[in-house]
UniProtKB/Swiss-Prot annotation:
PANTHER family: CROOKED NECK-LIKE PROTEIN 1, PRE-MRNA SPLICING FACTOR. The gene is CLF1. Its main location: nucleus. Associated with the spliceosome. This is Pre-mRNA-splicing factor CLF1. Belongs to the crooked-neck family. HAT repeats lie at residues 48-80, 83-115, 117-149, 151-182, 184-215, 265-305, 315-347, 349-384, 394-430, 435-470, 472-510, 555-586. It is found in: Nucleus. Keywords: mRNA processing, mRNA splicing, Nucleus, Repeat, Spliceosome. SMART domains: HAT (SM00386).
Length: 714
């Protein structure tokens, strides 16, 4: 027998489950409190019951007089059970005395009267409510709704007018307009809109009026005029009001206006609207960039659909104008944008706006303390302005004032602009036949005085000198050149002295003043030899070469040769020696000169003869000996290579073989520098090795071994 199974069965019978607990709890729960039903048998019992209920309500209200739900239940009980309207109204009035601003109680009170069809009481209560709380829109809405439901339409208008006298929110105006629209009283609605936009002036209200005229009123010819008038009035009013100029609804109104004009087939009117908004400078100063961009986007879409080539180009021009205007407003120092913006304005022939824009641009002076690209672009704005006044406007006096103002802006002690000075001088010459030349000379003289504190301005001197040359004023030209030289010597860049001197020499050469040319060349050589003047670079070689070329052109070859001698003494470079050698083959010999002088022909056929070759070889030998003596192997190799090229062009086979034997052999060697070994190239000259009979050079040994190897091979 299984005792374990029996024991488990007994235990399970004695256990209490959760199901049993819940079942017992449900069976033993408290019964609901059932109040005994009270039956009223006579009038005394009724009055006793009423008194008891009223005491209960009053006790509750004494505990919390702000419990408006209790007041409401109290009043409803009086009506529902006792049909005592005066007592119920008394309860409502007592509640309002507690808090007259409690809007829900007002509405319940009014609904109470309406639900029992006490219309007169409800009207009186509504009138009292809006008089007591005129700023509460809900009470006004309830009032007009009640009167409209009662079809007392004239009273509704009176109530709305009372309401509007308190300057309510736009919702009151919208409700009044919607009321008139429901009964097709369009003239009344239009009159309300006229007052509406004056009290609540905004783009949104104008759009409501526009939508009303376009969508709610039947279309006829008179209505088309009304719609157009509303559009015009809305745009004019918004542009005239400082508070509404930045309203983004303006762009929406313009777009809606143009679309409406398109709908009535008035394409030119639509285009004129866009162009007026985008081209008028007065309007452009008023509207914001965001408005401008939206209007232009609408204009672009319009031209894509209804425009031709000219109108599309016009729209592109307007876009560029708006773009540059936005850029100059964002970055006033962007002179490229100023230039482009002004160019567009000039094409529009709006002279006053163009002049104002020029003035705006030139007021933004660059802050750079050096002659930067920004300064250059800024100065060109001045030049453009002056030319515009002179040539386009024909105002000579304005042009003169602009040139003078431009000169006052430039910091001449740091830098100047020759363009301004020269253009001003040309301006005076063009526009003043009597005194223009004198004025131009004063301007140019002033330019030299003010702008030469650091170094002379080459362009100024060049223009002034060319002007005097055209007039044949040689003495003035010489004075200018002398002043140029003087200022060049004072400045830091003394190389400009040589350049100005050479320009001076060219002038004297052109007027056949050869003695002056020679004197100026000699001055230049003396200056070049002065190390105190030229501290950074030495222009002696350049100056002497120019002097030599001058003598060569004048066929004064002996003087040129002596200058070459002086040059190789001071500047002994391979380049100078080679130039000297080739010079001897580039000039005619004495016999050739004599033959030319005796000849009647105007042209001389030059040819290199043996005299040229020997003289040139003599210079090459002298150069070779000089570099050999000074152990300048690389320079010596350069001279021999040039000599070889000369013999290839002008010499014989024998002379070419002789010079070829002089060519050095380049070998690699090693040497110690600061304890480190490095490779270098060395030049071995055969003629130097032949001069050493007691010692076989490395080259001769190498050649001997090579010959021996060839013999063995054979």
């Amino acid at each position: 027998m299984n005792t374990d199974g029996l024991s488990r069965e007994k235990v399970s019978d004695s256990q209490i489950t959760s199901e049993q607990i819940l079942q017992d709890a449900f069976q033993l729960k408290d019964e609901p409190l059932n109040r005994p039903k009270q039956s009223i048998q006579d009038l005394d019992e009724l009055r006793s019951f009423q008194l008891t209920k009223r005491k209960e309500y009053e006790q509750q209200l004494n505990k919390n007089r702000l419990n408006f739900g209790q007041w409401l239940r109290y009043a409803k009980w009086e009506v529902k059970h006792n049909h005592d309207f005066p007592r119920a109204r008394s309860i409502f009035e007592r509640a309002l005395e507690v808090n007259v601003q409690h809007i829900p109680f007002w509405t319940h009170y009014i609904q109470f009267e309406l639900s029992h069809k006490n219309i007169t009481h409800a009207r009186n209560l509504l009138d009292r409510a809006v008089t007591t709380l005129p700023r509460v829109d809900k009470l006004w809405f309830l009032y007009v709704q009640t009167e409209e439901t009662l079809k007392n339409y004239q009273m509704v208008r009176i109530i709305f007018e009372r309401w509007l006298s308190w300057n309510p929110n736009p919702s009151a105006w919208d409700a009044y307009i919607n009321y008139e629209k429901r009964y097709d009283e369009y003239d009344n609605a239009r009159e309300i809109y006229i007052r509406y936009v004056q009290i609540h002036s905004s783009g949104e209200i104008w759009l409501k009026w526009i939508d009303f005229e376009m969508n709610d009123v039947p279309i006829d010819p008179e209505q088309v005029k009304r719609i157009r008038n509303v559009f015009e009035l809305s745009v004019d009013s918004m542009l005239a009001s400082e508070a509404l100029r930045g309203d983004i609804s303006l762009a929406e109104i313009i777009n809606k206006w143009s679309l409406w004009e398109i709908s009535v087939k008035e394409y030119e009117r639509a285009r004129a609207i866009f162009q007026l908004m985008l081209k008028s400078d007065t309007i452009q100063e008023i509207i914001t960039p965001e408005q401008r961009n939206q209007i232009y986007s609408s204009y672009t879409e319009f031209e894509k659909s209804y425009g031709d080539k000219d109108t599309i180009e016009s729209s592109i021009m307007i876009k560029r104008k708006l773009k540059y205007e936005e850029e100059v407003n964002k970055s006033p120092s962007d002179y490229d944008s100023w230039w482009s913006y002004i160019s567009i304005l000039q094409q529009e022939d709006n002279n006053e706006v163009t002049r104002e824009t020029f003035e705006r641009a030139i007021k933004v002076i660059p802050t750079d303390a050096f002659k930067s690209t920004v300064w250059r672009r800024y100065i060109y704005i001045w030049v453009k302005y002056a030319f515009w006044e002179e040539f386009t406007m024909g105002s000579i006096e304005n042009g003169r004032n602009i040139w003078n103002k431009a000169l006052k802006v430039i910091p001449h002690k740091r830098f100047t602009f020759a363009k301004i000075w020269i253009s001003f001088a040309q301006f005076e010459i063009r526009n003043d036949p009597e005194n223009g030349l004198a004025s131009a000379r004063k301007i140019l003289g002033r330019s030299i005085g003010q702008s030469s504190t650091v170094k002379p301005k080459r362009k100024l001197f060049k223009f002034y000198i060319e002007l005097e040359q055209k007039l044949g004023e040689w003495d003035r030209v010489r004075k200018l050149y002398e002043k140029w030289l003087e200022l060049s010597l004072v400045g830091e860049n003394n190389l400009s002295t040589i350049n100005s001197l050479l320009t001076y020499i060219d002038f004297e050469k052109n007027i056949q003043e050869h003695q002056r040319c020679i004197s100026l060349f000699e001055l230049g050589v003396r200056l070049a030899e002065d190390d105190k003047i030229f501290t950074k670079v030495n222009p002696l070689e350049y100056m002497l070469m120019q002097f030599i070329n001058y003598y060569k052109e004048e066929m004064r070859y002996a003087e040129a040769r002596s200058l070459y001698r002086k040059l190789v003494e001071r500047v002994s470079t391979p380049k100078v020696w080679i130039s000297f050698a080739l010079f001897e083959s580039s000039i005619p010999t004495d016999s050739q000169l004599k033959a030319f002088e005796e000849s009647t022909e105007e042209e001389f056929e030059f040819s290199i003869d043996e005299t040229h070759r020997e003289t040139t070889r003599s210079v090459f030998r002298e150069a070779n000996d000089f570099f050999k003596h000074n152990n300048l192997k690389e320079d010596r190799a350069v001279v021999i290579e040039a000599w070889k090229q000369y013999e290839e062009a002008n010499g014989s086979e024998e002379s070419l073989r002789d010079i070829t034997k002089k060519l050095p052999v380049i070998v690699k060697r090693r040497r110690l520098i600061e304890g480190e070994e490095e490779e270098y190239l060395d030049y071995i000259f055969p003629e130097d090795e032949e001069a050493k009979p007691s010692k076989i050079s490395g080259l001769n040994a190498f050649l001997a071994n090579a010959q021996k190897w060839m013999a063995n091979q054979n």
